[in-house]
Amino acid sequence: MKKLIALILAMVMSISMVACGGGEEETPKSTIDKILDKGYITVAISPDFAPSEFKDPISGEVLGTDVEYAKYVAQYISEKYGKTVELKIEEMDFKSCQAAVATGTVDFSVNGYAATAERQENYICAGPYAVVSAENDTYHGALVKKGLKIETAEDFKGLKIGAQQASLQYNLAMEQLPIDEMPEIELITTLPLGAIQVATDKIDALITDSGAAESIIHNNPELEMAAFKFEYSSEGNVALVNLNETELGALITEALVASGDVMDYDTLRNEMAQKAIEMGVEVLG
């Protein structure tokens, strides 16, 4: 009888343990854990702005300063966690890169982003990285046909300008130019196309930086940078991370800040600019 009771008690305890165990829920894995499990991290890049990001016209490989910083992020994560993490590049246009981050389609994006107030409201701005040295004298201004004088913001009245949507240059134009007295800004998908629109009188000016203009002017001698300069002080670039991914954002910030100890932006930019030129790719920044 005692054996029977003991057997029944054992069965009851066993059933109870199974029932309790079945009710437990596993803690969802963090994005970082998922990256470590997959062995790669995804980055959205628009490869149309050499030397920051461009494609080898023969192999199709995406290259550039931003690519090198993204690679360093993957390397940093690998070394920090002791697991191999590779970089997987997702190519798309500039606007789509930001949308991909917002929807969680990619882990992060690098495209020479500035930490604007709007971006800080909608994304984690990880970084900074690629901090420009004091000796670098590039500026943001307007690429125009020779003969068109633009010296002040007021000179833009009545002119049709172009800029990449959601870019720093677009925001500078919206903030510092008399937009209410100008035609609607022409949204440019790529800077090379914007330069063509200036050359063919589709727009009066392309809002860009002087570094981008150097190569464009070299290949299009009828163009020049206007005397006007936007007021802007660079504090480096940032990577965009989904606003809800605070842990991942902190990790990418950690990696990008650390990159400053092992990567010199000015040297890297010159190397990538030379590589782009050798490949016949127009250097735009």
Predicted regions and their residues:
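Acidic, polar ligand-binding/catalytic clefts
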Residues: 83-155
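Periplasmic-binding protein-like
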Residues: 47, 130-144, 210, 214-256, ...
